């Protein structure tokens, strides 16, 4: 996982040549792994779209708040327009229950079906877990710090789906 730095703005003013070089370097890096996940953060900026072009699949992570739902829909809409045929999957994050996660996903799904005529599948749901802020504060993965927590179990289910196509865990 290559995580974006929150609020850094480091990619905003990157030149086209440097962006191309970054994309090439990521492809070299990816060759040594089963999957590479890049956290681009929310947004529809050209830099995010250019990096998205090299992806085989896009995972859209959304919470049940209005702004993230709107941002997720906007990202899918712009990406679908600029990169026809791109596959999307959705993860409902920081939800209080599986039912709330399904409700969050269905809100986004209904908008995508009504206006974009696509139905991105639900990849998984990650429940709100008090262990996550602890892991963040210690700069440790939730899977390392609290491997038996609800959030860690949810992340593992998603990882299995990504690594083993067709799994329904």
Predicted regions and their residues:
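P-loop/Walker-type NTP enzyme "switch/lid" segment
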Residues: 1-31, 136-138
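Inter-motif core of Ras-like GTPase G domains
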Residues: 25-35, 45-67
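NTP-binding/hydrolysis catalytic cores, primarily Walker-type P-loop NTPases
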Residues: 137-169
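Beta-strand-loop-alpha "switch" segments that mediate conformational coupling across diverse proteins
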Residues: 115-143, 155
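Conserved C-terminal guanine-recognition region of P-loop GTPase G domains, centered on the G4
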Residues: 69-88
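Conserved beta-strand segments of the P-loop GTPase G domain that flank and frequently precede/overlap
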Residues: 3-4, 38-39, 60-63, 90-93
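G-domain G4 guanine-recognition motif of GTPases
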Residues: 63, 88-102, 124-132
